Every structure is written in structure tokens, then in C-alpha cells.
Swiss-Prot record:
This is NADH-ubiquinone oxidoreductase 49 kDa subunit. The lineage of its organism: Eukaryota, Amoebozoa, Evosea, Eumycetozoa, Dictyostelia. GO terms for cellular component: mitochondrial inner membrane; respiratory chain complex I. Transmembrane segments: none annotated. Complex I is composed of 45 different subunits. Component of the iron-sulfur (IP) fragment of the enzyme. The gene is nad7.
Amino acid sequence: MLNISKIFEEVKVMKNFTLNFGPQHPAAHGVLRLIVELESENVVRVEPHIGLLHRGTEKLIEGKTYTQALPYFDRLDYVSMNVQEHAYSLAVERLYLDSLDIELEIPQRAKVIRVLFSEITRVLNHIMATTTHAMDVGALTPFLWAFEEREKLMEFYERVSGARMHAAYIRPGGVAFDLPMNISEDIYKFVIQYRKRLEEIEDMLINNRIWKQRLVDIGIVSAEEALNYGFTGPLLRGAGIVYDIRKNYPYDDYDKYDFKIIIGEENNSYTRFIIRMKEMYQSLSIIEQALNNLRPGLIKLEGVNITAPDRAFVKKDMESCINHFKFFSEGFIIPANENYTIVEAPKGEFGIYLNANDTAKPYRCRIKAPGFLHLQGLNMMSKDHLLADVVTLIGTQDIVFGEVDR
């Protein structure tokens, strides 16, 4: 005789399903590994595992001179190269110039070139962020359109520095080289043409029914949560908080440029997409203003230790040749001092704490990357959403693991 009660005793209780996501997953933005706990297809918990791209950057910098350390910053967020060079150059300048009894200011032309390429970098980043996000969700066409435009911006990098990505162009005291002939006209033509391309991408995505269904009400973050988690950039401004370092704590004369801080109301994935799209329009406006502000002049400080001798003199004068060699091999000494410098990177607040100790090498360099703070909020943003929405949320955070793992 069949014992029904015994059968029911043997039925096991269903437990939550644990899934390993990445690090090989194409939507993992590099080397992100997530341990996702699911109840059916609903997310209960997301645990990010980081460190797979850790290279010990902060420790490596301690063994390099202030000049030799600069290229490390290109390799943190490798989509926003010049902005990080900008932050490091400002940090070194402030450390060095604070130690002098005289007041020195970076030449005006150098400041304008820095702003110009920082905003070109912001457009580079947002092109990557918005269109790869669209590709992760399933829209391939915007990605193909935008990367055609991104190639043109990479060519501007190459024309000023010789490198498409790791330019080492913005340096303490100014910039490495002056702008080559006709590049200003070409950048201006790009701005005019890219505005039309942006409108085409907006037409494809902004009112797209499927795109909105995948993004609206996904990953809502309140203003209080954004502040508690240390969010900055589009993730903070999406909550309606007006915070942009270019406006709040201007550097390199950003206060002289006319642009708006784009904020949102409902801080969901769709809001953050709109913010990044509108920020590209603002960056194009700043680029135009910078081109109009370009005047003949010096591109770096002269007569100070933090800039290399001009190459024109190196080939004519033995003393300049020796100074040039010693500048790159031995570096320059900065008296004991410390500072914390922040810039508005495309992803948020990028900060550098530098500590000098009367040597030619930093005693300590601490890097604050926005992506590291954003990633810790992924669990909070993912709860009660579907597994497919986790891919959307990784995209809306715009994570790059060079800066997260360092």
C-alpha cells in the first residue's frame, strides 16, 4: 500500500539558486565576477568579486619619479585617459607650486588645450558608455554608428601625441606638445557633424519602446542612497543633486565656460542614459568655446623644474641636453607636502591624494576612482529585479575595471 505521508516527508524544500556571472561574460565590462543569488529569476543578492585586474598601481607609483608615474594614469580608466592625466598633473603642480615663494600660473593656452582634450575625452567615454550599454541590452546599430565617430576622436589624440589611447599628453606644468596645424578646424568640423549623429542615435533610442521597457524603473536610486554610497557623476546627478566639480570646484578656468549641469528626477537607468546623452551636447559646446579661446602663447611653464627643457634647445645646447636627460631619468624634488586633488571625470569624481617627502618620488599616491564606489551599490540597485536587468545595471554604472582594481 502506497504511504502518501512518507512521500511528502521526502520532498525537499526549494532553496535559492546561486549563479556565477562572469568574469568571461561579454557584458561583464572586463573582468567582473558576480555571485548572484536568485529566487526563480528574481535577484535576491548580488556579490561583486573584484581584483582580477589588480596591478598594484599605487605601489608602483611610489617607485617612479613624478614624471615617470604619469603614464600609469592613462591605464586606470582606459576609456577616459586624458582626464586622469589632468588630475595627476594638477596634483603635482599644486604640490610643487605651493612650495615656491613666488606665484606661478599655468599658461593660458595650456589651460585651454587641457580643457579641450578633457571634453573630447568626456565625449569618448559617453559614446562608449551609452552605445555599449545599448548593445548589452540588444540594440547593435547605435554601437556601430558611434564607434565610427569615436575613431575620429582617437585620431585627434594621435595627432597631438602620437598615441591613440595612452597619450601622456597633459603633463605637470602644461601639455607635452602644441596643437598641430589644422587640428582646430578639424575638431570644429567634427563638432558640427557629430551633433547630427547624436540626434540620429537619440531618434533610435529615446522613444524606442523596447529600450524604455528595459531601462525605465530599473535600478532606481534615491538622493539619500546616492549620497550614502558615495555616488558621483551621472549616478548622483540623476537623483537631482546638482554636483559637478567643474562648477563646484573649478580648475583650469572651467568657471569661464558656459555650460549646464544636467540633472534628473527619477534616478533610474533611463534617466542616467538621458543625462549622458545631454552631457555630450554640453561637452561639444565647451569644445567650441575652447577653440574660440585659443590664443598664441606658451604651452607649459618655463624656468621651473617640473617641465622638461624645450627639445629645440636640446639639440643645440649641451646643458639643455643634460637637463633633459636628468629630468626624465632622475626627476625633480618636491618639498614635504600633501594635497588632495579632484576633477570631474566622465564617470564621476576622480581624486588623487599625493604625499611628497623631499625626494623625486611620491611617498604615497592614493587614487579615488568613482567606479569602485558605484560597484558597491550594485547589490542595492539589483534587488527584486530580474537576472536580465543585472546586465542593464552594469551598463548604467559605466564600470571600467582598470580604475576599480588598480
